[in-house]
Structure formats: C-alpha cells, structure tokens
Amino acid sequence: MFRTVNGEDYSPAVQQRNILDFGKAHSLLWTDNGSANDRCETGGNCRESGQDRVKRPMNAFIVWSRDQRRKVALENPQMQNSEISKRLGYDWKMLTEAEKQPFFEEAQRLRAMHRDKYPGYKYRPRRKAKEATEIASRRLFSTVQPNAHRGDVVSLPIQGRLRQGHTFTNGKPVKPLTAHEHKQLTPATGASQQLDKPAPQ
C-alpha cells in the first residue's frame, strides 16, 4: 500500500497549500493522535495532577514541522528524534519569510480559535522535576537549620545535583571527610575537629 511520490509533492508551495487546506477543513484544533493529552483540546476528559490541562496553541514552527517531522522520519527511520529536531530547526531557519508566512497565518488562526474556545486560558508551564527537587531540598534545609546550635552537625538527605556526602554546620557546607579523617571519628561523639572547617570555595 505504497504510493509513488515525485519531488514536487514536497515542494514548499504544495506543502503550504496542503496544510492550509487541511486547517480550513477541520474546525477542531489539530492533534497528532487520539491520546489522552490530545483530548484536552477536543473537549474530552483530560486530567493531569487533578486539574484540567489545556494545551497551548501551536506556533508557526510547530505547524510547519508536524508534516516535515513525519516526512524526515519516514525517509530516515534510523534517525533519532533529537537529530530530527535539529534538522527541522535548521531547515526552518533556511526558509524565507515568504515561505514561512502561511504558517504564521495558520498559527494566528489557531490562536484566535483557542482564545475563543478557552477565554480564560493562561499558560502555566509544568515545573521540571529538577526544580521541584531543589525547592524541596531548600525547604528541608530551612526547617532544620533554625534548630541547629553552634557546632552541631546537621546531615540532610541530599538529592539531585547537590554533592552527595556533604554535611552542613551552621548553614555552611563542610568538606567531605577523607578516609584518614573518617578513621579519626570517635564513636562517642561521632564528630571530629575536621567538621568545623568550612569547605574550600
């Protein structure tokens, strides 16, 4: 079930005409497939983190790149998605303003439809996992730090990109113990004089 395609089918003029015809023929915002996230745009049930989530309208690059991504993926099945994205970004930059104009117009039309369908919509980006971890670490430190007395060692469960094994004394990082220093720890106190030295900056 393959069809023979000539090079003219992928010319910018034919692609622009096909995209504009498709957009005018469909009253709903475009979606790639019927996945759960896409049902947000078409009025279906969509729950994420206990709240309804409405996707942003597509910009001109996304409108253009949808068909281009499929074409590149079919021509190069071994190519990674990240490589396809780089190639599409480069190809988009190489287009002239006249070639991009229909996609900007289509994106503007989609924004207007989105504004009419969701009048109170406000873009709220999802917090990245790394940010959430760092915020949680800061909150934990701020709750433990006031209870620490001068000279007390406060060990925190450190996550993310912070260095493992670091402890804090009075809010300042302390250099990690070497193997020799670790042997000098006394079982009764669990601390050594080395812990009072601040970490080198």
Swiss-Prot record:
Superkingdom classification of source: Eukaryota
Gene3D superfamilies found in the cross-reference section: High mobility group box domain (1.10.30.10)
GO CC, one annotated term: cytoplasm
SMART domains according to UniProt: HMG
Pfam families documented for this protein: HMG_box
Coiled coil, from the record: none
Annotated compartments: Nucleus speckle; Cytoplasm; Nucleus
SUPFAM superfamilies listed in its UniProt record: HMG-box (SSF47095)
DNA-binding region listed in the record: 54-122
Entry GO MF terms: calmodulin binding; DNA-binding transcription activator activity, RNA polymerase II-specific; RNA polymerase II cis-regulatory region sequence-specific DNA binding
InterPro entries: HMG_box_dom, HMG_box_dom_sf, SRY, SRY-related_HMG-box_TF-like
Single GO BP term: sex differentiation
Main subcellular location: nucleus
Biased composition (Polar residues): 186-195
Keywords: Activator, Calmodulin-binding, Cytoplasm, Differentiation, DNA-binding, Nucleus, Repressor, Sexual differentiation, Transcription, Transcription regulation
Region (Disordered), start-end ranges: 164-201
Entry-linked PANTHER family: SEX-DETERMINING REGION Y PROTEIN, SOX TRANSCRIPTION FACTOR
Family as reported in the entry's similarity comment: Belongs to the SRY family.
Task performed by this protein: Transcriptional regulator that controls a genetic switch in male development. It is necessary and sufficient for initiating male sex determination by directing the development of supporting cell precursors (pre-Sertoli cells) as Sertoli rather than granulosa cells. Involved in different aspects of gene regulation including promoter activation or repression. Binds to the DNA consensus sequence 5'-[AT]AACAA[AT]-3'. SRY HMG box recognizes DNA by partial intercalation in the minor groove and promotes DNA bending. Also involved in pre-mRNA splicing.
Subunit organization: Interacts with CALM, EP300, HDAC3, KPNB1, ZNF208 isoform KRAB-O, PARP1, SLC9A3R2 and WT1. The interaction with EP300 modulates its DNA-binding activity. The interaction with KPNB1 is sensitive to dissociation by Ran in the GTP-bound form. Interaction with PARP1 impaired its DNA-binding activity.
The protein's name: Sex-determining region Y protein
Gene (name only): SRY
